[in-house]
Amino acid sequence: MLQPKKTKFRKQFKGRIHGTAKGGTDLNFGSYGLKALEPERVTARQIEAARRAITREMKRQGRVWIRIFPDVPVTQKPTEVRMGSGKGSPEYWAARVHPGRVMFEIDGVAEDIAREALRLGAAKLPVRTRFIQRIAD
């Protein structure tokens, strides 16, 4: 699963996801993509599950690009532990996804296969998404 090799600090503030995506809103690599429509934290496990669903539907043809990276450590305290005594330990990694952000791109397959593959991948994600495609020049 995806996670940073090294970070400056072990724990981060929770933060909020305000506004829309500043960058990464257009297709850069592939012909088809999956764009987020709402703000949400997407975990590394969810990204991996979506990637597997997409590649399985494409039958290992074409190419998949993951345009988001889980760089936010999410902490959790153990179950049945009283409040207080500091912050919990990092449990998993998540990516903050803004509305308008392209999360996945694919290329090298037909449009109907791409549409179905991204639909199956979107089912694994906690955000509403939209299928986008490059405008033919």
UniProtKB/Swiss-Prot annotation:
PROSITE patterns: RIBOSOMAL_L16_1 (PS00586), RIBOSOMAL_L16_2 (PS00701). GO terms for molecular function: rRNA binding; structural constituent of ribosome; tRNA binding. InterPro entries: Ribosomal_uL16, Ribosomal_uL16_bact-type, Ribosomal_uL16_CS, Ribosomal_uL16_dom, Ribosomal_uL16_sf. The keyword Repressor does not apply. GO terms for cellular component: cytosolic large ribosomal subunit. GO terms for biological process: translation. It comes from the Bacteria. Binds 23S rRNA and is also seen to make contacts with the A and possibly P site tRNAs. Belongs to the universal ribosomal protein uL16 family. Part of the 50S ribosomal subunit. NCBIfam families: rplP_bact (TIGR01164). This is Large ribosomal subunit protein uL16.
